[in-house]
Amino acid sequence: MQLLGYETGALAFSTQAESGEHERWADEEPKPEHSKSLTGARGSAYSRDPGSMIPAILEKMRPRWGLAASLFLLVLDGSGVGRAAEPNMIGQYRARRIALRKSLDDGITVLFGHREEDGDLRTGFFQESNFYYLTGWQEPGAILLLAPLPDDSHAPGYAARAKLPREILFLPERNPEREKWTGRKIGPEDDNVGKVTGFETVMPAEKFETELHDMLQAYARIYTLTEQSAAARLKLLEPLREISNAASAIAKLRMSKSSEEIALIQRATDVTLDGHRAAWQRAAPGLYEYQIAATMTEIFAESGCERNAYSPIVGSGPNSVYLHYSRNSRRMDAGEVLLMDVAAECSGYASDITRTIPVGGKFTARQKEIYEIVLGAQNAAIAAVKPGMTLSKSAPNSLYKVAYDYINSHGKDLHGERLGKYFTHGLGHHVGLDVHDASDPSAPLEAGMVITVEPGIYIPEENIGVRIEDVVLVTGQGAKVLSAGLPRDPGEIEKLLGTAAPARH
């Protein structure tokens, strides 16, 4: 699944892993024309751009408060319902914050959670993933303020810095009238707020302005996520100084997965495989693509996964050649291929699996030829996965090149040309809290990283699109395929499809 897009809650700034509803293949610039909705994932559909909501009072406050006024006003209207940080993960969230504070040791860090769209009953609220990664907090309107780890007591300004809180979580105060609609949420005034958040210092969001001002007396630099949209970005950044981007530091932490994170990704993957198996059993001529998508989504929910990791991509026949086809509205016919790029999200962590099967139970000779080339490319790339390799297209140690070279040296199109030109996207991406998780595609792989390996060939002239995608854990010795339980061999696929249920109309 090669798409990503959501606005971050950190001033609605976007990072490399959060490209504002633009597809981002490894090593390439965003491509808005390929952007797709992330219904069911953390997306811009779930938050408003704070930059479009700056009131006129901002200009009056700037002379006194500067950055504090600018940032504070962006989150005052946060409200809604969420849930507390997972108790068994609180220590891990704290360890992540400590690691970030150690990395960004010359300034304070300010991050904002998402805010809830008033009256939005279609999607609900989903937390900004960087904020969730560091806090585990699931309610809207929160702010995180971090100071560096304690420094040398002999360093200049130590006395002033030592008096400041090191970690503050700001929460909106409860609104009883709003809670009549949204349900009860947790406010800074609640007696157990420290226990449920895992923070020693929790304050009302209204105090963020003052606390930030106090910290600015001791630290000159502020880290946040610094890419904001449109004119509001200029209004905010013009009067500010010493603003640095925290995106790369956070992405570096998120790229390496803990054992708990790997277990959650494995859980999402196992459920995803169950969904694919159910879809295979149902797929038959006469059904509609959306019925296949619904079958998988039902399995995800019944298995305890809260949502799809992204909008299902279920393309049959001519629709199989479109990378991010999501209309899912066509009636399937016998003799076509059906490409299903669908996955679950469980406990906040995504999987990302694609399989291509024949509608009617048997590949044609040409479909099987193309399928086996893609499978060979994927096998070659997975065999090459090890620490030190990259997902970048241009690096000498590129996994993409392994897959591309295989495709380009096997088979031809109807005009006798090589097939490499039909492999039109990157090989893969990192997976985690986001289906396209925060990462640096040029960085060498390390043990503990989780990536996808997903070569594909898409030939519009033949109405054949084939992609095979698996989730892979990088180990010290090579790779462990977390999705190995779902067949890829065309013979095994055909055997399983032989028991497919008849079409239901």
Regions found by a protein language model. Give the residues of each.
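Short, strongly patterned local motifs
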Residues: 1-18, 25-26, 33, 37-39, ...
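Generic detector of N-terminal low-structure segments
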Residues: 15, 74-75
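Short, positively charged and aromatic/hydrophobic N-terminal segments
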Residues: 21, 46-53, 57
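Active-site neighborhoods and metal-handling regions in enzymes and metal-associated proteins
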Residues: 57-65, 82-505
